[in-house]
A protein has these predicted regions:
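Conserved, well-ordered active-site substructure
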Residues: 95-115, 166-214, 223-250
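Active-site-adjacent helix-turn-beta-strand microarchitecture at beta-sheet edges
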Residues: 93-167
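Short acidic-glycine loop/turn motifs at beta-strand connectors
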Residues: 44-46, 91, 126-131, 159-161, ...
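Zymogen propeptides
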Residues: 21-116
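Short, solvent-exposed aromatic-acidic interface loops
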Residues: 57-59, 138-143, 192-196
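Bacterial N-terminal signal peptides
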Residues: 9-17
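Bacterial N-terminal signal peptides that target proteins for export
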Residues: 1-8
């Protein structure tokens, strides 16, 4: 029998050599940028399942994070993050291109009109496998992209590393805003302001702080975030399209 005092050094060596348990990843954080408060959530499509959601099997619009989460739980999945994802009509149906699970439920809207959606150029956030992008609408149509998920909104905040020329640094409209940007074809950054900000300040956040060469405005007045890692669950107005990150329940 080996004496305990001879086993102790070996046991200690094994203990310190063992890898530490991985800390749970928190994709969301609160930040300040040029005096304004934001919450940002960053994901990688190579590892994270980013999807769009609108209605259940009965064609009833989810309308809330709670309803969506409950539906996912029934499928053995859970919601890690969610945000409103595009503008919609009085029935809470998208007013622009909407693709879910490879099925196009609404075609691209290229009409002119009033409001932020029609503040050209507008654009499309899309996900296809491990790739994602924010693409100006006309370019998206010209390239004939067929992603698994897509939502159209407007205006584009950043295009090719430049702030949308229709967004001026002299703008005075201050609102809560949320949007999405993509870099390197797979890093997806979502942001929501925690206080009213101008379009230019919001666009600058994506270009300078989040390093996204392309970014899209999702909405303003109804902006909402579900981030359980931050104990945040916004419950404001009923929503239309929702973007979420999902994982299988263990």
């Amino acid at each position: 029998m080996i004496p305990l005092r001879r086993l102790l050094p070996f046991a200690l060596m094994l203990f310190f050599a063992a890898p530490a348990a991985a800390a749970p990843r928190n994709p969301c954080q609160d930040i300040e940028d040029v005096g304004a408060s934001y919450t940002i959530c960053v994901f990688d499509t190579r590892n994270d399942s980013i999807r769009l959601f609108l209605a259940d099997a009965k064609d009833e619009v989810y309308g809330s994070f709670s309803a969506l989460d409950a539906a996912l739980v029934q499928k053995g999945e859970k919601l890690l993050f969610a945000m409103n994802a595009g503008m919609y009509d009085e029935r809470r149906l998208p007013i622009g291109l909407y693709v879910e699970g490879g099925h196009m439920e609404k075609s691209a809207n290229t009409h002119s009109g009033a409001g932020n959606f029609h503040m050209k150029p507008n654009g499309i956030f899309w996900v296809e496998g491990a790739r994602a992008g924010v693409t100006e609408t006309q370019r998206f149509l010209k390239e004939r992209l067929h992603p698994a998920y897509a939502t159209q909104s407007g205006p584009m905040l950043v295009l090719g590393g430049r702030i949308n020329p229709r967004i001026h640094d002299t703008g005075t409209s201050m609102k809560i805003r949320n949007g999405v940007g993509v870099r390197d074809g797979h890093i997806v950054a979502f942001a929501i302001s925690n206080q009213p900000v101008t379009f230019h300040a919001f666009a600058t956040l994506f270009r300078e702080r989040l390093k996204c060469p392309d970014a899209l405005f999702l909405d303003g007045s109804i902006s909402a975030l579900y981030a359980p890692s931050l104990a945040r669950h916004d419950r404001f107005r009923p929503m239309g399209p929702i973007v979420g990150v999902v994982e299988r329940m263990r």
